[in-house]
């Protein structure tokens, strides 16, 4: 009996390694050291010594990990695997920049039922695309074939991001104060949270198939809308951070993921402060309205589960809010004043 008889194909793994090599190497810069396929990836922190010393006197490394959750089940239903890798990168790097740091490199883990090199290459293409968007290197990864654990065409994935921030420029929300402005950056739909509820409502209770096109979605299918990739905010947010280096301009940063605005915005504010959110300051995207109507799901539950169209929030000094928003718009972001910081909390206030 062989390992292949037991369901693990080492040759398929070797073919996958060859297929994904160009996808991995397109994310590399001269800061990546060592040959492709080594036991561990190496990344040079001080590649440009002069530039490094100019920006980092006390560099602090940042690490985070996250996954995509049951959004993968929508990908299985549509048999489309080239975007969930973008989600995987986004969920990590959008978290990482919340302390003011920049992503350096990314690692991934895939657990699969049957290793199909072509299908795995689609997943890695998405991860590679996400790394390019986030300007970080795909430094390495692991793919484990476990036929006793997963169904043949199913898999799970996890990502790990490492970044760096100058110690004196760490953003932790401690200098936020009443009167500061909360700037919202628009999401591109559901992103990667709330899929347990979204699938239950749309695919089970409402009975939609992934190919169905409800009129509420303006021509998009249910599957297309649910599989829309998570927006990566790295380049835009870092551009603002580099332009406004004075610490008391950008006070706090929040990635709006599971728990929505109520579960994420208070996390970055000190005790005694909250944000008064203007509910009418943005138009809630159609996908959220459809979920709410078909559930039905009440407003409070929607706000506590989904991003509701707000993917990221910056808390900034009031005198700088308008120029920061102008800069973000030139970078391609849709943004608006979400509300203002005031005394109170820990819950958000709604206007």
Model-found features: residue ranges?
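Residue-level signature of catalytic and energy-coupling elements of molecular machines
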Residues: 9, 66, 179, 255, ...
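Hydrophobic face of alpha-helices
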Residues: 17, 121-124, 195
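Short, acidic Gly/Pro/Ser/Thr-rich loop/turn segments
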Residues: 13, 49-50, 68-71, 166-169, ...
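Glycine-/charge-enriched secondary-structure boundary and capping motifs
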Residues: 2-6, 119-134, 150-155, 209, ...
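Glycine-rich phosphate/pyrophosphate-binding loop regions near the starts of catalytic domains
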Residues: 22-188
